Amino acid sequence: MDCINTLFSVTGQDAHAVFREEQMVTVANAFKDGAASYSGDNSANVWQLVLFLRAGYYVQSNHPSDVGQYGQDLATAIEGGLDAFFANAHSKDVSAGNGDVLGEVVVLSDSANEQGRYLDVYKRVLTGYNGSYDAIPSMLAAVNDVYTPLWRGNWNDAYVKAVTADPSIIDTLDSFARDHLDLLGTDKSYLDSNAGMNVGRYVEHQPLQDKVRPLMKGLLDASKITGPTAPLWVTVASQADSYDKGNCSYYGVCNLADQLTKAALPVTHSCDQTHTIKAQALTAADLDAACASLLNQDAFFHKLVKDNGPIPGQYESTVQIVVFASRNDYQTYAGAIYGVDTNNGGITLVGDPTKPDNQPMSIEYQKDPDDGFPAGIWNLNHEYTHYLDARDDMKGDFNQQTTVPDVWWIEGLAEYVSYGYRGVTDDGAVSEAGKHTYKLSTLFQSTYANSDVTRTYPWGYLAVRYMFEKHPEDIANMLGHFRTGDYAGGYAVYNNDIGTRYDDDFDAWLTACASGACSGKKAR
């Protein structure tokens, strides 16, 4: 699987050689043959064929000039494969083996833009769900995968026409959301809230509005803005706000972001004139602990990066720290209130520092179990470092800051300060150091696009720590450029001036780090 997954990043002549239409047709025909004899698991390697086809559609969508056009020959072949798979009785098996393959095939129906053809299949998967699935993660994932074509199909005219002609899929989604309210507040809450979200998504389409509006209102009435049913309420309300805003009073969702903020973040506390916390459930003691940690971090940061204070001409003098009571609450509310992705451990928005009304903020949550951060606020000091770095080291907004490969610095510094300031050993980084996975010169090229979590965070930490301990003058040189907005000049310091010169020394340093040199002492 790992080998096939690498194909999603193929470009250029390789993309044409691997994914041109005749190649895809050959694989689609092989998938059809495998689907006809599918036994309910991956013993015949059907999964690999499906992943290859998904990769082909993905690469062609993103690099059509590399791959070339796809036409009716491929459409016919892929429909034959999908038809054969879904007609096979084993595609209905409730088992770990079938769940793995079924979910991928469902997503393939979306990749191929065949959503309208398989509405009955999607209904079958949703209505088939029952408690027997709960002990089989891959079956739960397969049910959730159905929401991908149902959601993305809304941009496909053929799909919208199919749903308009037979809107029973909307009734299936509504019934799923109503029949499984008991999932809300559990670790399977997403199955129910995603059903409600998809019901609401159809309200964009005028021919479906008379059907969808009362269903949305019914789901809102069956749930509440806070408490265990909030994930359903918020997702449906968000669809009304996005696609039927003119009728907000009918749903009771006018000024939705304000409603959600008042309901979910009732606590407002000023640490001082420039640091404000908005929280869901922090106690007075929690607020005191968080404020003390934030305010004391400034001096530690300044001593480390040796800045001259805030970058002149930027509006980043105040910061708001938003803290939800749990990861579930963060994922329920943060996207709807602030428009952020919540598939992360928190996020910092520096905004547009050229605007006088700019308000940087970090959006976080309390983690259970607590990992030792003040007030249990996960990544509190990591996210606050992002704010300080933007204010004092990196001129411009986030897009300007990332015009060059500098994720090793952005995320590595945040990790290094977070662990060093708290005097905690980064056990994950120490473990990675012993593996010697990356050269320093490779880490210097890290971007959010080419790096996974391990390369971004523990290896970013290691790169930054090494540079501070062994070559602080290079960091000073680099930051001198970053602070004026000269990101190309800063990049040249480590890409051109340093290049590969430190790779051998970094490798030796990693050995020492893994042997105890990277203990929990405070960074200097």
Predicted segment positions?
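Extended, non-catalytic scaffold segments that flank or surround catalytic motifs
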Residues: L53, S61-G68, I277-L282, P405, ...
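Non-catalytic all-alpha helical scaffold/repeat segments
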Residues: M1-S249
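Extracytoplasmic/secreted proteins, especially bacterial periplasmic and envelope-associated proteins
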Residues: S168, A289-A292, N296, A375, ...
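Zinc-dependent metallopeptidase catalytic helix centered on the HExxH motif
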Residues: G351-V430
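Metalloprotease/metallohydrolase-associated module, dominated by Zn2+-dependent proteases
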Residues: V404-D474, R524
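Catalytic domains of carbohydrate-active enzymes that cleave complex glycans
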Residues: L119, I136-L140, N144-R152, D157-V160, ...
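Short alpha-helical "patches" and their helix-cap loops
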Residues: Q69-A75, P214-L219, D427-K435, E473-G490
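Non-catalytic architectural context of zinc metalloproteases
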Residues: M1-E22, Y38-D41, D174-M361, L443-Y457, ...
